[in-house]
């Protein structure tokens, strides 16, 4: 009997999902992206070689895996072709192993232009988007005016829709944001220069998935970003534009919630966040700088430095609630090597003095929130690359156990380095 497993971030993204997806893909037939776009940077280190995937599922590096892009993903033709070119230059067969839902909304140049214009206009109050047009593309989807992959099959109808949409966007870009308009003919020509390649990969993703389940093969769903960036459940408005939570598997791939057998939440042994928004345990001292330096905390897509802080059990408890998380994979434990003491946030003190154990929903409700910490002893031993659980320092084992107690979910996988071999699988999601 095959298993269906979802892997998702349980913090603010950048938890190390790409490595874990790649690690587990030797067990599966299909790897599926179900939300987000090329704003997701999944970094893989295999035999010392670094690969960053932004749009194509991480399973593409395994020859026996078919990769699917579900309807919940916003697809940039330009980004797709660039990523395909990079992979094919390395000898990886993409075109025969990548299938795309025809219901995917397209990201086009006017979405990118609008993204940049809005962030520039907001100034210091900007959301902190990646500037890749993700939000505006999702806006068009909800407004029911967006162009989709299916529209590539009729160039004349596509051109008519494109003209109407560009009239709307260019009016705003020129008259409100005072920037250059997007050229209609260039946009049309650029899209249709690659349309045949994309059309050749179109498939009924939902039917493929349900056939695979009937056949008893393993399926892995690859989430992007993190739970606390979810459009509905994150620190709104400092969120992404898609559902980064387990529910996105149903809406973004047509695979119902009862069909998921296991949800693996990825957590760092500490916390990071890119961009603006609440971050209760953020460190502004030497400890934060040390974590950032040792953890190489820079965005895979943007290169922006990540904000760093202590592990926030309150936020992760919220992720457990929202996603029905079965087990965790903890990454970057080795980054905490050498700290004399470590802190875990166990509760929040609200501005009115109330002590709460669950995270607020809206960003405004985080204002004035103070972390309540529990201090634990650190360890001086080196844990980098350790692959036997019993070989870890006792203080590290105690730290992991305490986090398990606070969030109510076991750590089933432990990562002590960037390479796929630097991992301990304590309980296999496809066997559990």
UniProtKB/Swiss-Prot annotation:
GO CC term, one of those recorded: cytoplasm
Principal location: cytoplasm
Binding site for GTP: 13-19, 41-43, 306, 332-334, 415-417
Pathway(s) the chain acts in: Purine metabolism; AMP biosynthesis via de novo pathway; AMP from IMP: step 1/2
Cross-referenced InterPro entries: Adenylosuccin_syn_GTP-bd, Adenylosuccin_syn_Lys_AS, Adenylosuccinate_synth_dom1, Adenylosuccinate_synth_dom2, Adenylosuccinate_synth_dom3, Adenylosuccinate_synthetase, P-loop_NTPase
Sequence positions that bind Mg(2+): 14, 41
Localization, UniProt: Cytoplasm
Catalytic activity: IMP + L-aspartate + GTP = N(6)-(1,2-dicarboxyethyl)-AMP + GDP + phosphate + 2 H(+)
Keywords: Cytoplasm, GTP-binding, Ligase, Magnesium, Metal-binding, Nucleotide-binding, Purine biosynthesis
Chain residues that bind substrate: 300-306
Pfam families named in the record: Adenylsucc_synt
GO terms, biological process: 'de novo' AMP biosynthetic process; IMP metabolic process
Molecular function terms, GO-annotated: adenylosuccinate synthase activity; GTP binding; magnesium ion binding
Enzyme Commission numbers on file: 6.3.4.4
Entry binding sites for IMP: 14-17, 39-42, 130, 144, 225, 240, 304
Known cofactor(s): Mg(2+)
Cofactor note as given: Binds 1 Mg(2+) ion per subunit.
Residues at the active site: 14, 42
Assembly and oligomerization: Homodimer.
Function summary: Plays an important role in the de novo pathway of purine nucleotide biosynthesis. Catalyzes the first committed step in the biosynthesis of AMP from IMP.
PANTHER family: ADENYLOSUCCINATE SYNTHETASE (PTHR11846:SF0)
Family that this chain belongs to: Belongs to the adenylosuccinate synthetase family.
Name of the protein: Adenylosuccinate synthetase
Gene designation: purA
């Amino acid at each position: 009997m095959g298993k269906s497993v979802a892997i998702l971030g349980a913090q603010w993204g950048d938890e190390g999902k790409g490595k874990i997806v790649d690690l587990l893909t030797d067990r599966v037939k299909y790897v599926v992206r179900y939300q987000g776009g090329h704003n997701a940077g999944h970094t893989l280190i295999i035999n010392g070689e670094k690969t960053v995937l932004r749009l194509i599922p991480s399973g593409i590096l395994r020859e026996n895996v078919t990769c699917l892009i579900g309807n919940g993903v916003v697809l940039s033709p330009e980004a797709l072709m660039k990523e395909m070119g990079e992979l094919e230059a390395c000898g990886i067969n993409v075109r025969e192993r990548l299938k795309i839902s025809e219901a995917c909304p397209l990201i086009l140049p006017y979405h990118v232009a609008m993204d940049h214009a809005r962030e520039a206009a907001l100034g210091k109050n900007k959301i902190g988007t990646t500037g890749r047009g993700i939000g505006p593309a999702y806006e068009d989807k909800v407004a029911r005016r967006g162009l989709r992959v299916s529209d590539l099959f009729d160039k004349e109808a596509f051109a008519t829709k494109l003209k109407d949409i560009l009239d709307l966007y260019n009016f705003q870009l020129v008259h409100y944001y005072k920037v250059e308009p997007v050229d209609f003919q260039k946009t049309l020509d650029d899209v249709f220069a690659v349309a045949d390649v994309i059309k050749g990969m179109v498939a009924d993703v939902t039917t493929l998935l349900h056939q695979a389940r009937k056949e008893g093969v393993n399926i892995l769903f690859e989430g992007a970003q993190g739970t606390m960036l979810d459009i509905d459940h994150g620190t709104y408005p400092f969120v992404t534009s898609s559902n980064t939570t387990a529910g996105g598997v149903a809406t973004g791939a047509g695979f119902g919630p009862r069909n998921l057998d296991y949800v693996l939440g990825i957590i760092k042994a500490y916390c990071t966040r890119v961009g603006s928004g609440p971050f209760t345990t953020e460190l502004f001292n030497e400890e934060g700088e040390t974590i950032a330096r040792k953890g190489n905390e820079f965005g895979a897509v943007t290169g922006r430095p990540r904000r760093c802080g202590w592990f926030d059990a309150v936020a992760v408890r919220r992720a457990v609630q929202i996603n029905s998380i079965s087990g965790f994979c903890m990454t970057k434990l080795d980054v905490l090597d050498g700290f004399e003491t470590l802190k875990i946030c166990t509760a929040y003190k609200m501005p009115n003095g109330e002590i709460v154990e669950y995270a607020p929903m809206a960003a405004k409700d985080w204002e004035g929130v103070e972390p309540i910490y529990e201090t634990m002893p650190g360890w001086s031993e080196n844990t980098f690359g350790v692959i036997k659980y019993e070989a870890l320092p006792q203080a590290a084992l105690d730290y992991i156990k305490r986090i398990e107690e606070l969030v109510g979910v076991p750590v089933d996988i432990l990562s002590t380095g960037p390479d796929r071999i630097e991992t301990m699988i304590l309980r296999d999601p496809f066997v559990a």
